[in-house]
Amino acid sequence: MNITTILPQTRKAYSLIHQMTGDLGGNSHGGAIYGEITMVSMQKIVQLMKRHTKLGPGSRFIDVGCGLSKPNIHVALDPGVEFSYGIEMDVNRWILGMNNLKICLDEAIGKGQSKQNEQFLHRCILEHGNIESAKNFDPFTHVYMFDVGFPPKLLNKLSEIYNRSQSKYLICYHGEKDMIEKYGFDIELIVKVKTNMHGSRRSHTVFIYRRVSTKKNENIDLITCNGMPCDDLFHDAWIKTKKGDLQSIHEGIKQQIMIARQTSEPKRTNLQYKDLVQKPSLSLRSKIKKKKNGKSSLPLLTTKRHLQFIQKVLVTSQMLIFVHCYP
């Protein structure tokens, strides 16, 4: 297979995500991470992981800071990993990612896709949480993180978590000098490749590493799932992929999105919320064509357009939140 050969179901998923959130990346909502990886670049990474790290149906994949959920959905479809898990600490980006997963599940259910594709999507779980709560990365075989913009304090913590794990592979965007010498990850480089990003239009090099040693978890109370070590933070999600069916997963996602929308702005009145939805930012207003009578038309935003609007207007506030969390 050519390194950039992309499966039809993967192309369809990216098309649906584009309809929901456009080309803008994770930073478009205001985070400190600039851009979201393109479909072609992610496919290159997937093919390299297949070739060099045995990524396949038996693999378990985690995306630390999953943002809009593209890598998670991608590997759930190709190669159809056993468990695709994403964790995001920013509630707004998590909601965007959940909406992206929801529309892919909508398509799978509504269009009557094959049971195999439904099963692949059913293995994808996104959670709102803090990765620093984990003691290790078990049961994941592949740890992926778009760590451009991660503060040193967080990378030091992730090094401790990874070194206590049995996870075999680490995929990230920092070179050997930083990851091994500065942050102390017990890894060695396998391969690296250039990638392109949406939003920022920047290119970044992704580095694929393998573990060189495994430290014993002498001071950690391990729990197991399916006979494998599993950190408590990931246990329930993994069980959910084993026991839940597609319909129950789909309904659960819809309920989580609804609850998150209701609780993310607890102090906003219905009138204020209506005003926010109806009025775009000044930069957007300038792009709206005026009617013949000279008055601007400010159309009511749909759910999809509201999500895009959220991405555009909270840049400054979200960067302040990020700095506060990781000084």
List PLM regions with ranges.
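S-adenosyl-L-methionine
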Residues: 1-58, 95-138
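A short SAM/SAH-binding and catalytic strip from SAM-dependent methyltransferases
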Residues: 132, 140-153
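C-terminal substrate-binding/active-site "lid" region of AdoMet-derived donor-dependent transferases
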Residues: 150-218
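Long, low-complexity, Ser/Pro/Thr- and acidic-rich intrinsically disordered regulatory regions
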Residues: 209-317, 327
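Conserved SAM-binding motif I beta-strand of class I
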Residues: 83-88
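Conserved SAM-binding loop of SAM-dependent methyltransferases across substrates and taxa
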Residues: 70-81
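Conserved class I S-adenosyl-L-methionine
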Residues: 57-67
